[in-house]
């Protein structure tokens, strides 16, 4: 394993260590022999696993925690007023953002990064599964738990590093991968990009141009925003999607006993490949296809690609299916991280495709006041399509409330448009579920805030079938 260029920094402290982007980086650093400490507001199962590796993690943020640190790595969610960050600045301790550390960790490897508004966690995980299946033992850092291995990161023995690239705060520009995927570009995180879709699009151009001249860029040309930026990218492009304008075109899709079968046509060479996936939804066919394109570019055999797809069991909180039993009645419970209207619609379509005759009840926790404001009408359009909607309060994610933006107002607009929404809390949601279990067959917990805790409580309360 090649050495890193910052071995002199023995003691590394990570502020916000439990975040989905931080935990994987911390794990890799600890396994690479660094002494890692960290702080956060709560201890998650992932943090407990990190502590088992030897990392010291404290609840709360206190200046004394970093007195022995040589280097501080800060999550983008951390305020500039954080007491640890303030102390580090006064003490002239080197401070870097998480993405800069991730980019540094990538340098000794042949690196692959997956960016995009939607699908990047799933796509990154599929790539890791395929490379594992091919015996390449990749190192990877992903923003969700890979269910087949029960973790979001791995320090492998091979020459590849596979990472998820986060565009939400522009930090993916710290990465310089040799192979990159852009799954799609949607109108999300516009609060950071000054409400400008053009600025968001340009950030993806800049990300693509970070590739070396010999790098490969894999694009979904079905996406309108990607088509807009393509002319400004000067790297080798491999395209994928359902349209015939793509180099790799998805054709002849068929659903059989919960498995999606499809063919992939190389429109240049006319080669035709047959694949299948247990993942649900049209959006996941695009995710799978992106991963296949990466594998083909890296000369992985079709046999090993199919092996990796077969071994892939999904990602935590990405259309994660379980069964519960309420008063002797079996119900489907789906947990999904999606919090943008496009993602919610994809989840809803996948649910209806997989459980076509079932009635769906969704519990949705809107994420951020700014997102709810920017996409208010889009949320209304999607959420009116749900048989029964239970709305939790907006999860602020450190934002201040915005006048006129609330779950109550969202509910009113949904119901004005012939939707069926009610306001609930975590506790009253469980009560409603128990009292109305005859009225639905599929229960969906949807969102990126604390709703995963509600899903866990539902599983705890009602028997989970093995």
Model region roles, listed by residue range:
Residues 12-17, 446:
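Conserved N-terminal Rossmann-fold NAD(P)-binding element of oxidoreductases
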Residues 38, 140, 180, 219, ...:
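Structural beta-sheet core signal
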Residues 35-49:
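NAD(P)-binding Rossmann-fold cofactor-contacting core
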Residues 2-13, 21, 25-28, 32, ...:
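Nucleotide phosphate-binding/pyrophosphate-handling subdomain across enzymes
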Residues 332, 380-439:
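C-terminal helical cap/extension that packs against the catalytic core
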Residues 39-40, 58-61, 96-100, 141-144, ...:
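Beta-strand->loop->alpha-helix junctions that form or flank phosphate-binding loops
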Residues 4-5, 14, 21, 28-34, ...:
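Phosphate-binding loop of NTP-binding sites
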């Amino acid at each position: 394993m090649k050495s890193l260029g910052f071995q002199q920094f023995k003691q590394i402290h990570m502020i916000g260590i439990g975040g989905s982007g931080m935990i994987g980086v911390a794990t890799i650093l600890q396994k690479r022999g660094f002494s890692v400490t960290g702080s956060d507001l709560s201890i998650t199962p992932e943090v407990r696993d990190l502590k088992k590796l030897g990392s010291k993690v404290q609840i709360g943020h206190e200046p004394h925690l970093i007195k022995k640190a040589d280097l501080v790595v800060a999550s983008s969610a951390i305020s500039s007023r954080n007491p640890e960050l303030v102390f580090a600045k006064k003490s002239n301790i080197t401070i870097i953002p998480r993405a800069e550390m991730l980019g540094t960790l990538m340098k000794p490897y042949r690196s692959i990064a997956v960016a995009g508004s939607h699908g990047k966690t799933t796509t990154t995980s599929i790539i890791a599964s395929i490379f594992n299946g091919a015996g390449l033992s990749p190192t990877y850092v992903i923003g969700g738990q890979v269910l087949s291995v029960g973790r979001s990161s791995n320090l492998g023995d091979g020459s590849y590093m596979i990472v998820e690239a986060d565009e939400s705060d522009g930090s993916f520009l710290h990465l310089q991968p040799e192979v990159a995927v852009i799954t799609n570009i949607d109108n999300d995180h516009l609060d950071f990009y000054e409400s400008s879709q053009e600025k968001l699009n340009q950030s993806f151009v800049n990300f693509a141009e970070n590739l070396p001249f010999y790098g490969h860029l894999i694009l979904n040309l079905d996406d309108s925003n990607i088509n807009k930026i393509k002319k400004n990218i000067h790297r080798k492009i491999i395209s994928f999607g359902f349209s015939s304008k793509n180099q790799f075109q998805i054709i002849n899709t068929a659903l059989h006993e919960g498995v999606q079968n499809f063919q992939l046509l190389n429109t240049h060479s006319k080669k035709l490949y047959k694949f299948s996936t247990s993942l649900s939804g049209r959006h996941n066919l695009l995710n799978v296809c992106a991963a296949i394109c990466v594998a083909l570019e890296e000369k992985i055999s079709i046999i090993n690609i199919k092996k990796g797809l077969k071994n892939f069991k999904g990602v935590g909180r990405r259309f994660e299916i379980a069964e519960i039993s309420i008063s002797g009645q079996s119900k489907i419970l789906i947990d999904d991280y999606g919090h943008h209207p496009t993602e919610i619609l994809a989840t809803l379509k996948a649910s209806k495709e997989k459980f076509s005759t079932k009635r769906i009840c969704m519990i949705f926790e809107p994420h951020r006041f700014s997102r709810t404001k920017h996409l208010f009408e889009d949320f209304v359009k999607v959420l009116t399509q749900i048989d029964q909607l239970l709305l939790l309060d907006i999860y602020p994610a450190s934002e201040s409330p915005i006048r006129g933006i609330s779950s109550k107002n969202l509910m009113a607009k949904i119901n004005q448009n012939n939707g069926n929404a009610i306001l609930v809390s975590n506790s009253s949601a469980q009560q409603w579920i128990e009292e109305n279990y005859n009225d639905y067959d599929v229960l969906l917990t949807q969102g990126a805030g604390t709703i995963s805790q509600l899903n866990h409580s539902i599983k705890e309360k009602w028997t989970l079938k093995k």
